[in-house]
Amino acid sequence: ETATKTVKAFRSEISKKHGTDSIFSVFIAVDEVPEKFEAISSGHFFYTPSKKGLGETHRSEMKSILENWSVNSKEEVLSWLDGFCKLSTYEISIPVLKDRDLAPQGKTGLIVSTLFEYDIVKKAYESGWYGELKEELEKRIIEVLSNSIYPILKDRILFSFSSSPLSIESYSG
């Protein structure tokens, strides 16, 4: 019985916590044959568009944005997001390259994920522009990939949707 109480107390305490790094994922449906993507990359890999990477500058800028959220404009946050997307590392998965039955004939689906700070998404939600942040992040990720590894991407997108750290939290609790 003591062990049960300890476990319940631990569960209660841990349920109030959250991590800092989480995942932002975008699914992109593309009107393009898988072979075009296969000529560029494998079905699963990590990609960083810039050798510079995020590094300490990014972390200090992000910390400043979070600490000054109430005085920063939305435009300042979105400007920071531009730099983030250009320097981030992406995990890219193209399931149809492993199994052609995983997409309609002549179509390709990409799953693109990157680490993303939970607190930024949470603050955007609390400020009333969570949906816009998701759309802007999705748009910037697609733009970065279109301007680098996948120039075929931009004009061939059928649809896309994303999940943020808050999406993950809502499903996992």
Labelled PLM ranges:
Residues 140-144:
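Short, well-ordered amphipathic alpha-helical segments that serve as non-catalytic structural scaffolds
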Residues 84-95, 147, 151-173:
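A glycine-rich dinucleotide-binding beta-alpha-beta segment and adjacent secondary-structure elements
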Residues 28, 112, 145:
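Hydrophobic, well-ordered secondary-structure elements that form the walls
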Residues 115-119:
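Short connector loops/turns at beta-strand edges and beta->alpha or beta->beta junctions
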